[in-house]
Amino acid sequence: MFTSDLIIIGSGPGGYRAADYAARCGLSVTIIESKHAGGTCLNTGCIPTKALAHDAKLHQRSWTEAINRKNEVVSQLIKGVETLLSQKQITFVHGQAKFKDAHTVVVNEALYTARNIIIATGSQPAIPPIKGAQSDTVITSDQLLSLTELPRSLCIIGAGVIGMEFASILNRFKCKVTVIESLKECLNTIDNDIAKRVRKQMERRGIEFYLSCNVKRITGNSIFFEDKKGAEQCVNAEKILIATGRRPNLSGLDLEKTDIDFTPKGIVVNENMQTTKPHIFAIGDCNGRQLLAHAATFQGFRAVNTIVGKADKINQNIMPAAVFTEPETACVGLTLQAAEEQGINAQEVKGFYRTNGRALAIEADEGMVKLVINENDLIIGCHAYGTHAADIVQEVTCLMNLSATRSQLSDIVHIHPTVSEVLQDLAR
């Protein structure tokens, strides 16, 4: 039996960053991975999609060339993670972990035990119960990233983050893209006005949207759906991408042997990422809280801090997010509507890229920024659409963590010319 201070199951951003941090805190760590180091983010998520989005924007590589470059980027970063996990206090084990009891896991018939365990197994594409969804023409986001030949046409079921990013990417590679969404608007988790602007811009590029529509069945290359009037419609495509969400990777772990609470939506945890067994933690997608790589990372930091008895000031309620369409959109905090629904007296101020010198100079004048301010002048939300939107929102994330006010933002000198001046201007 191999004993260490901490076992981590999963080596995505949550797992490998937690392993590195725990080692630096003096703990001996065993990290177990059933597939490839880096998890979904590095292998089939954040990084490969951003590599493809970059090539899509430049129009300099074919799809096949872009896929090859994506693979090179992923391989390089995997080596970096493997190097990080090769340090003295970390033992990397490749294989499927199964719990024997609340302190012990079995991997390749060997036993590993630890005082504390962090589950960081991530998630996988969720396939809805649509008749014909197992057809050869139907693919997941994981499979799309392995296609060496660009399909002539693609129908995407789902207009969330994954669906919209792939719609934007494949459209730039001259693939005919159709998106079917059951809700009234795309990107239902962000500001509705900005979501509408994203969709309208993509429609101008030739992407076709069917909103408030429910897919009923898939037959070969045909997708049959019911439109908002109740009439049956049909769309044909060479490939069909299911992008209707993700579900936690919990099968095969034998979690029942730990007596921790979990549901199909994820493992139940408290604010310190502890399960109902306080020495077992769950971070990232597998707890179903926030399906974001950076959320997993900071949940991992919180878990390790709890283990070593260190207090931190990580505010998990201020969690920025971005959608890397072209142009991108990003957000943090509350929308005005959400603030009002919570009984918060708030106002919204807007700034537009079309008045920004840098945006005009680089031909990126389509965009806007919204700040949500409460009655005490505190910034409680920011929602941006346009080039460098994620960077703008990151600035506001810093301000919100410092409980900054709109008037304080107005006094911060911003570099000229930058798109970030939109923030400074709307604060005045």
Model-predicted segments: where are they?
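Beta1/beta-strand and adjacent pyrophosphate-binding region of the FAD-binding site
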Residues: 1-12, 150-160
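N-terminal Rossmann-like dinucleotide/flavin-binding domain of flavoprotein oxidoreductases
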Residues: 2-4, 41-111, 189-213, 220-221, ...
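Core beta-strand elements of the Rossmann-like FAD/NAD(P) dinucleotide-binding domain
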Residues: 2-4, 108-116, 230-239, 276
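Beta1-alpha1 glycine-rich phosphate/pyrophosphate-binding loop at the start
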Residues: 4-6, 11-76, 169-189, 315-317, ...
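Flexible, glycine-rich terminal cap/loop adjacent to redox cofactors
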Residues: 7-14, 18-35, 40, 47, ...
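Glycine-rich dinucleotide-binding loop and its adjacent helix/turn
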Residues: 46, 121-176, 180, 208-209, ...
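Rossmann-like dinucleotide-binding cores of NAD(P)H-dependent redox enzymes
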Residues: 72-78, 82, 145-146, 151-155, ...
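FAD-site-proximal beta/loop scaffold in flavoenzymes
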Residues: 134-150, 234-307
